[in-house]
């Protein structure tokens, strides 16, 4: 809500760049993207409590392997599409809504993938989308970095480095930053300016939805 309110009231000015980034996909064994030790994953007996046919849904038939269930299926192209599919709907929802982006006219993907058969999502990827102007709204270039570095920090942002993951909307007037979920928006301005902004925030224009 804050992202759209701040954009609509002109705090950012025209936004021509959006960047979102996350660390490499496969470097954490605690997440939902752990690759198999062999490719393709070897067949294993199906647990008695699992209806493997039902679980696969409309995907092509493949032998069961414990690496798929319950969560690591996200990293395999025949079941999921990695962090791009898992996180973009959260991280990039706010700029899509605020900027009224619609469909891109251009898309490009660069990736580094050590998996021989490319059935598992890449360890590093950089995806670029370009969106045409929408009325008075400027054209936008959006980039998704997955283990492919981060945008360069600009002096006017008042920070030394960007966090491990997040999203920024770079405006002609100001730049906005959020985490991977856009509920913690803040302006990238010097600390004193941000503290003053928090003391005197702009009026809310989008009503909260009732809880019941």
Feature-to-residue mapping (PLM):
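Contiguous beta-strand/loop segments that form the cofactor/metal-binding neighborhood of enzyme cores
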Residues: 2-212
């Amino acid at each position: 809500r804050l992202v759209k309110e701040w954009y609509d009231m002109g705090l950012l000015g025209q936004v021509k760049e959006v960047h979102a980034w996350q660390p490499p996909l496969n470097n954490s064994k605690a997440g939902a993207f752990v690759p198999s030790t062999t490719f393709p994953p070897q067949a294993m007996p199906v647990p008695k409590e699992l209806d493997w046919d039902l679980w696969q849904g409309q995907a092509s038939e493949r032998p069961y392997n414990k690496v798929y269930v319950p969560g690591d299926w996200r990293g395999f192209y025949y079941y999921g599409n990695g962090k791009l599919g898992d996180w973009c709907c959260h991280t990039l929802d706010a700029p899509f809504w605020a900027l009224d982006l619609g469909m891109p006219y251009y898309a490009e993907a660069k990736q580094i993938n050590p998996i021989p058969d490319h059935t598992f999502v890449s360890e590093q990827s950089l995806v670029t989308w370009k969106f045409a102007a929408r009325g008075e709204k400027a054209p936008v270039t959006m980039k998704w970095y997955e283990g492919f570095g981060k945008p360069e920090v600009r002096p006017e942002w008042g920070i030394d480095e960007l966090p491990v993951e997040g999203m920024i909307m770079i405006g002609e007037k100001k730049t906005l930053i959020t985490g991977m979920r856009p509920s913690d928006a803040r302006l990238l301005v010097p600390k004193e300016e941000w503290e003053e902004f928090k003391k005197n925030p702009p009026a809310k224009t989008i009503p909260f939805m009732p809880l019941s």
